Amino acid sequence: MKRNILILGASYGSLLATKLAMAGHDVTMTCRSATSNLINDKGTDVRIKLRDEDSHRAFLSADLPGKIHATTPDKADPAAFDMIALAMQEPQYRAPEVAALMRRIAASGKPCLSIMNMPPLPFLARIPGVNASELRSAFSCPEVWDGFEPGLMSLCSPDPQAFRPPEEEANVLHVGLPTNFKAAEFADLAHTEMLQQLADDIEVVRVDGKEVPVKLRVHDSLFTPLAKWSMLLTGNYRCITAGEPQSIRDAVHGDAELSLNVYAWVDSLAQKLGAAPQDQVPFEKYARAASSLLKPSSAARAIAAGATNIERVDRLVQALAASQGMCHPEVDRIVDLVDHRLSTQVTQAA
């Protein structure tokens, strides 16, 4: 059955949109007016390297069986879609037109799949023993999540690494690390079955007889997407320094012993919350992948560019750990450094 999916965010969201359209589903992405006009005029261009090929292939939306359309948040009607995907950075949801759309989405009762690094508060509320109200300070605008039913919110770990090449237009996305999206199930079996059907449709797509990387995997554990936390605290947030940002590779391999220690500590937090060891990704596998990540993380690049607000998974993990009687000096250092960099830039912006 063909599905109609709404995705908030047309940058990273264009990767999921392309995978869904390759499988025959229709997708509408919300974005700024200029980007919306560009996508509707020229289409999307997502570049993925197939296995055993030397260069990336460009997958153009005009060539796909499903349709990709773009619109602005104020024009999106959630009731017209089967499922909503959230693919924006957490601070972006506080923009008035996006916050208004989020209220409409919550009222629609549609299942929502987050592919954010920052797990939404309604998803955190699904984890037994977690008091989501104690975590609101980690969010730039926690109010946008207040109307959502927790069981309608799932989380999909955004493991594939992709970026907009700076020399290209905003409709282009380059996939640097084509790993899989890993989603937790919904509370309602019918919603999980819909998600699994999307995953199955993506799985069978072939191009010239070859599989296309970046699959959607559905897991019965709420904790599988949380494996990303260890990666974020070990690599992404440690790209942030007092000066220029460093690459994820250097953040991880510059002090491999400390990286392993941080990674294992975040894993232990997830397990204390209820994760099973098999929900986690072994450090060795992550370290191998990190060795090819030669750019700073998006969080580090944003701070280097003068941002006054970024996603704060570091602060979220610190707060969750404190609720479990846990702390780690390197995590505390990261949080303090990010706080300092952001507050300095807030002052400078004023």
Predicted regions and their residues:
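Rossmann-fold dinucleotide-binding core
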Residues: A79, S114-S230, T234-G235
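Conserved N-terminal Rossmann-fold NAD(P) cofactor-binding segment
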Residues: T28-D82, M102
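Rossmann-fold NAD(P) dinucleotide-binding segment
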Residues: K75-P120
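Anion (oxyanion) recognition and catalysis
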Residues: A21-M22, A106, Q271, A322
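NAD(P)+-binding Rossmann beta1-loop-alpha1 motif at the extreme N-terminus of oxidoreductases
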Residues: M1-R51, L121-P122, A350
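NAD(P)-dependent Rossmann-like dehydrogenase/reductase catalytic/cofactor-binding core
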Residues: P166-K182, D200-N236, G243-A350
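Residue-level detector of anion-binding/catalytic polar loops
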Residues: D26, P111, A276
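Well-ordered, non-membrane alpha-helical segments in soluble/globular domains
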Residues: A95-L101, H191-D201, N261-Y263
